[in-house]
């Protein structure tokens, strides 16, 4: 692509889906290799310097070991829309592949940011938190360590809940963190909580399932209750930052979802009935977004 191209035409040329095109362009924009303007995309000066064959600094040889067969497989398996994704397909069937290793990955992924967010004063204003799709309870463990008054319940698939107890015992909070082994989509959520937390959850799911989770959260808590969402947010122009952009590309390979912008997340929260959505704290690329249930009946706007 030497000249600017329409995004739709580029997707057709690459024979990949709309979601894959959006994800790849976000990464390339964050890496300063393409410029996106309205519905067109073009190469930056840096890209022209290193990625065009007529340049003396062309780096194409670095990629020549990737065979056409491998590219074809990647396109067919991962870059088309509506292709089953290996991780979320298993989760929807109630299975967790390699649960032990997934538990370690989830804990490593979540615990540092959770430990920072757990220090925020807002957690002094809640008593019982439902940690939805909370894995082995890394976020709840961090919350319990920093807020001794809190009682948390982690709801996730039974294979993950079965592993979780060893994590809470390791950190000495087994009496403050309980585990509920059930599917978050098909099961009724338990009552008696004044807050729900979705930490590194929404990026796994498509728009309709994100809406379903947030709506269930709204109905699970009383008026005055809160929702907390921990995610890496993209800039509003979806051109970065590089960390969330790359993570969104990883989601493309294994899940149904993608990273959201703050306005996209706020629209989902508002649609469910939550109000006053704000990114109340940041840790690295992560944001803790909070919103409140101020009325029993949702009056949110449509968001697609």
List each model region and its residues.
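Alpha-helical subdomain
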Residues: 1-30, 35-36, 123, 128-304
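Conserved Class I S-adenosyl-L-methionine-dependent methyltransferase catalytic core
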Residues: 2-5, 12-13, 18-127
């Amino acid at each position: 692509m030497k000249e600017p191209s329409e995004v739709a035409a580029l997707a057709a040329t690459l024979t990949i889906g709309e979601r894959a095109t959006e994800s790849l362009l976000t990464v390339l924009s964050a890496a300063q290799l393409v410029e996106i303007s309205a519905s067109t995309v073009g190469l930056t000066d840096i890209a022209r310097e290193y990625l065009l064959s007529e340049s003396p600094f062309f780096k194409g040889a670095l990629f020549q070991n990737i065979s056409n067969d491998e590219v074809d497989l990647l396109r067919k398996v991962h870059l088309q829309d509506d292709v089953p994704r290996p991780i979320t397909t298993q989760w929807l069937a109630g299975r967790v592949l390699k649960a032990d290793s997934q538990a370690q990955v989830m804990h490593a992924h979540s615990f540092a940011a959770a430990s920072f967010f757990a220090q925020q004063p807002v957690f002094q204003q809640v008593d019982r938190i439902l940690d939805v799709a909370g894995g082995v309870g890394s976020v709840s463990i961090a919350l319990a360590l920093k807020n001794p008054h809190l009682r948390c319940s982690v709801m996730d698939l039974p294979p993950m809940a079965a592993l979780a107890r060893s994590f809470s015992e390791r950190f000495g909070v087994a009496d403050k963190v309980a585990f509920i082994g059930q599917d978050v989509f098909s099961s009724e959520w338990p009552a008696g909580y004044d807050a729900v937390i979705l930490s590194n959850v929404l990026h796994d799911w498509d728009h309709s399932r994100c809406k379903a989770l947030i709506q269930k959260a709204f109905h699970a808590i009383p008026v005055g209750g809160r929702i907390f969402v921990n995610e890496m947010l993209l800039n509003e122009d979806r051109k970065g930052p590089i960390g969330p952009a790359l993570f969104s590309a990883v989601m493309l390979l294994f899940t149904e979802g993608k990273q959201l912008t703050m306005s996209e997340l706020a629209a989902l929260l508002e649609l469910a009935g939550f109000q006053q959505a704000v990114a109340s704290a940041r840790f690295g690329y992560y944001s803790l977004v909070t919103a409140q249930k101020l009325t029993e009946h949702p009056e949110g706007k449509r968001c697609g």
